[in-house]
A protein has these predicted regions:
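Exposed, flexible binding/inhibitory loops of compact, secreted disulfide-stabilized domains
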Residues: 3-11, 21-141
Length: 141
């Protein structure tokens, strides 16, 4: 009888050890609730340092998100990976202060059906400049 209760207690304890971390993740999910708007500028990648341009070049084949801080400004870079043709662009829908960090909302926009595209692959990305922040940057895309 003692052996059965020991096995049952072990199973229950194992289930709790597995489920509690899952519950805690669900309880602390990031909130994208807007607190205030933020000023931002979409910048030409050519104004970035050679170091950052090299980091983008290394990552742009796959989708990526990164931030770079130079003291005065934070640069948020979102790339959508390699696309089969040219003609893609990226819309920056919103950049705002949320309850738990800075939120960035972007969308990849494909070429219009009537638009002439080249068969050459492209790797669209956007660089967003905001005043320097010491907060987590989160992405909605």
């Amino acid at each position: 009888m003692k052996g059965i209760w020991g096995k049952i207690a072990g199973i229950v304890l194992g289930m709790l050890c597995f489920c509690i971390p899952l519950w805690s993740c669900a309880m602390f999910e990031a909130s994208d609730k807007k607190v205030s708007d933020m000023d931002f500028t979409v910048v030409n990648p050519e104004v970035l340092s050679e170091e950052i341009r090299k980091m983008i070049e290394e990552r742009k084949k796959d989708a990526f998100q990164m931030a770079y801080h130079d003291g005065s400004y934070s640069y948020i870079i979102v790339g959508y990976g390699q696309q089969e043709t040219s003609g893609y662009s990226i819309a920056v829908n919103d950049v705002y202060q949320g309850e738990d960090g800075i939120w960035v909302d972007t969308d990849l926009i494909g070429p219009e059906k009537s638009e002439k595209t080249e068969a050459a692959a492209s790797s669209p990305f956007v660089v967003i400049k905001i005043e320097s922040v010491d907060q987590t940057i989160r992405f909605k895309n």
